[in-house]
Amino acid sequence: MSKFIVIEGLEGAGKSSAVRYVADYLHGHGVARIECTREPGGTPLAERMRAIVKEVHDERLTIEAELLLMYASRVQLVETRIKPALADGIWVVGDRHDLSSQAYQGGGRGIDANLIGAIKRAVLGDFKPDLTLYLDIDPAIGLQRARHRGELDRIELEQLSFFERTRQRYLELAAADESIKVIDAGQAPEQVKAAIEAALAHYLKDEPSCIPG
């Protein structure tokens, strides 16, 4: 049975590299068909919504509009790419999913968790990842890494305190959900890769029927 695995984390945590690590590990363990996605974005329409969220505009984007754009982009991706792939036996590895909205818009922006939960239930129902790997990093270190990549986007331009609140919410959410595994992303890249592979090995051991044999 195909699975949906998600990588989460702050800016500079190494999510793109982690997506590759996961895909490579799965390929090495008999998973032939894997599709990688990102949020916001992942489809032509969802990418247009991503641009609105990420780019700096003359007009202020309200936090409520930001939240709704995130979920609009997300449900477009889920319904047009992720669910069809899973139904076709394709594993999906995602760079961000719903946990990002709970952490960024909920923790960082301070939007009420009940409102976010209501929107989530309305558009996603009970759909959720099978496994989430949260890459935990000191926000100051993550932002430093992001700056080294070049020009910052609208969200990356937020104050450090925003990312501290976001990280705190991530950790709270991880502590309450056993399907979310915390990976120390402040380690050297090879150590992060080893930790991700260990988490995958543990998950696949408990779900042996999902690996072709």
UniProtKB/Swiss-Prot annotation:
What EC number is given for this enzyme? 2.7.4.9
Cite the entry's keywords alphabetically: ATP-binding, Kinase, Nucleotide biosynthesis, Nucleotide-binding, Transferase
Q: Name one GO molecular function term.
A: ATP binding
Swiss-Prot/TrEMBL catalytic activity = dTMP + ATP = dTDP + ADP
CC per GO annotation: cytosol
Q: Which residues bind ATP?
A: 9-16
User: Record's Pfam families?
Assistant: Thymidylate_kin
Q: What GO biological process terms are annotated to this protein in UniProt?
A: dTDP biosynthetic process; dTTP biosynthetic process; dUDP biosynthetic process
Q: Does the keyword Membrane apply?
A: no
**InterPro entries membership:** P-loop_NTPase, Thymidylate_kin-like_dom, Thymidylate_kin_CS, Thymidylate_kinase
Function according to Swiss-Prot or TrEMBL: Phosphorylation of dTMP to form dTDP in both de novo and salvage pathways of dTTP synthesis.
HAMAP family (UniProt xref): Thymidylate_kinase
Q: Which PANTHER family match?
A: THYMIDYLATE KINASE (PTHR10344), UMP-CMP KINASE 2, MITOCHONDRIAL (PTHR10344:SF4)
Q: Which family does it belong to?
A: Belongs to the thymidylate kinase family.
Write the protein's name.
Thymidylate kinase
In its UniProt entry, the species of origin is given as Aeromonas hydrophila subsp. hydrophila (strain ATCC 7966 / DSM 30187 / BCRC 13018 / CCUG 14551 / JCM 1027 / KCTC 2358 / NCIMB 9240 / NCTC 8049)
